[in-house]
A protein has these predicted regions:
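Non-heme di-metal
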Residues: 1-193
Length: 193
């Protein structure tokens, strides 16, 4: 069952390329050339399939979390970057949120199959994996606050995700936010396994 879910998510990852291409077309960048991963990330992704699931699960979880973090930061910057292009901004946000909805499910699926040891390992991997990945992207310094992204990865919380995205995606039941009390506060921030 886990392998089938993984294959389904891999198909979604490939469909994201179509959505990214549509974003580029929104900016009339029809001739974008996709480049391979940098040296370190290329090596890491070649090694991933060779490890047993128990060893692969924490770094796989972190890569999904990293994607979601990047998309959240891009989404947060769209209003400023595309302030004078509301149609383009709205179209890019629509496409980006489709990807984010899938990524949210991928994070949930990966989280669902990790026990406390795997989750602890994933927490240790967040900073080095984020830094290694973004070191290979020269645009990082111009587009992102890497320290902020690392912090967001380490403190990821489903309650920070837009409710309409959670409604469309899949989130483990033990990670869903609890209802608010009469005074508006949450009984508990997040249920965790």
């Amino acid at each position: 069952m886990i392998a089938k879910i993984g294959r389904y998510h891999l198909c979604e990852e490939f469909s994201h390329m179509r959505l990214f291409h549509e974003m580029f077309r929104t900016f009339r960048l029809d001739n974008v050339q996709w480049v391979p991963l940098g040296k370190w990330m290329g090596r890491m992704y070649r090694l991933f399939p060779r490890f047993p699931e128990a060893f692969m699960a924490p770094p796989a979880f972190v890569t999904e979390l990293m994607g979601l973090t990047v998309y959240q930061h891009i989404d947060g910057a769209l209003d400023k970057i595309l302030a004078d292009e509301p149609k383009a901004r709205d179209r890019v946000r629509e496409l980006l949120r489709e990807i984010m909805t899938d990524e949210l499910a991928h994070v949930g699926q990966r989280r669902n199959f990790m026990g406390p040891i795997g989750l602890g390992a994933a927490r240790l991997f967040v900073e080095p994996m984020y830094r290694a990945f973004f070191r290979d992207l020269p645009e990082t310094r111009l587009l992102f606050d890497l320290d902020h992204m690392v912090r967001d990865g380490k403190t990821f919380d489903y309650s920070a995700i837009a409710p309409e995205m959670i409604e469309k995606s899949w989130v483990p039941s033990y990670c869903k936010t609890l209802p608010r009390s009469e005074d508006g506060s949450r009984f508990d921030n997040l249920r965790r396994g």
